[in-house]
Amino acid sequence: MQNLTYKILEKHLLKGKLEAGQPIEIKMDQTLTQDATGTMAYMQFEAMGVKKVKTELSVSYVDHNTLQNGFMNADDHAYLQSVASKYGIYFSKPGNGICHQVHLERFAKPGKTLIGSDSHTPTSSAMGCIAIGAGGLDVAKAMAGIGYRLTCPKVVEVKLTGTLAHGVSSKDIILKLLELLSVKGGVGKVFEYTGEGVKNLSVYQRATITNMGAELGATTSIFPSDEVTREFLKCQQRESDYIALSADEGCHYDETVEINLDELTPLAACPNSPDAIKNVSELAGMKVDQVAIGSCTNSGYEDLMKAAAILKGKKIAHNVSLVVSPGSRQVLMKLIENGTLATFVSCGARILECTCGPCIGMGQSPKSDAVSLRTFNRNFYGRSGTLSAGIYLVSPEVAAASAITGVITDPTTLEYADEFEKEQSYIDDSLIYAPSKDPEHVEIVRGPNIKPLPVNTPMDSTIDKKVVIKLPDNITTDHIAPAGAKVLPYRSNIEKLSTFVFENNKPHFDEVCKENNGGIIVAGENYGQGSSREHAALAPMYLGIKAVLTKSFARIHLANLVNFGLLPLIFIDKSDYDKIDEMDELKIENVNSLYDSLDLIVENVTKNETYKVHAPISQEDIDILMAGGALNYIRNQQ
């Protein structure tokens, strides 16, 4: 008897045993990239010398860098389109939609495996597949036919009972889990949803939950493939992709969490973390300045129809700016077709294109000290583009209700009709381009912003560097390598991007690294949580960072550090963290001894102290680190 997670993993297992905590390697059927991480991923794929992708399906999406206020983003898009055409990859044009929304609608299949260069790739697991977010280099390796290495996860059963009440959303289910478990509560785990309550959730509702499983730090989340899945695929004219998949009755789970949907109330994640949860009723009456409905979490057909039901026939409050961004062109066309877009426009909403937009700080930054309600998945400090703004994560129902009243409002207190026409999808794949049938004659387009890929040098046997920055718990990849309209255009230019590293924590960090010939980073718990962007490892590598010493790491960032040859270490005695100060000189000798033991000694030369540390890596990771990163390792193997 097996749970659903292990059923799919077993069919794709290349190496290892399905035992929690053990290293395994699995075959990936599909890949996806988005443009902010995709340019680097495809440059890495090119460096491997493979003539065509070896996956069943690979798709390149453009949904991040669509604010084209200079040549850089357009150049990147031209590069991505030419690479896709040459190497056997489908290309989704700007405006076609957010990668996760479009992939769920048009490509995700039950029972398959998917790896994507975006941390919210698990959105597609709502379809009953294993979808995992990773760094771009791991995605490039998958396209080259190389298996994906990970630690075999524990499987947590999330047993749902009951039915969501009027005004309560699937967003509230995942916010409840975050309240119970925190942003690091899912590290090393897959969350598998079971119970009678699952049958009452549509695929779009399930996708909201699997999407924000990333905020738990989970490897992925998964729902069964059932009649609800079949109906969704039928609407997408893809019923032939359906297979029934579920866990065996009486199968083993490492943990079980029970949630009664009948008892849930609307929730909000308060600034500046997705697990800072309060009941909306506790926040009711707080003045609101901005409301944003959209993102890969809540921009599906049903979410926007529910928001429109609350807004219909009303006007937004005079103090509120409301923006709405549909998740895909398919959804937008359906809203035009049934008149719902007119509802949004007439109430005073501003309609944005089908992209990530405000969720990644790409426009719509709120005013100073604003309260902004967003149906997004992250509210990290500074992510909106306004450092002083307070960002609250809420459901579309809470967002719409609050836009009308001008204050945070519990939608369960309002009367509105939330029954709407069953979706009959508007299917038009004309903005998804198939790869060329004549790839030999396709020329790669490289604009001046696309700089050569920086490559690390082999690991030294002794690391002797200063601590160039010391950081607290829960540092995100947004802290390390910020996003937003100012920075994202340079994701293909690591030299320029490196000047923004830690700019909100330590301005001119890049200059400190240059003055000290690189250095070591020291941090607290859950270092590198959030986005899968490998630039948070690649840019520090470019600046000469050789090791990162923390209390613990987030899963994807740990893998990215190894991929780029930065030595990850954790304190065996976490209190040693308090003994280290910025600019202390740390020496790590006999790094080659990792082959014999994953434990090392760090000498604090400045304070004449020593600390025991552990490298949370596998034997193959050691080979990669010693080579100076995965690209060097792959080249050495050829």
Residue ranges of each PLM-predicted region?
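Fe-S-dependent hydro-lyases/dehydratases of central metabolism
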Residues: M1-Q638
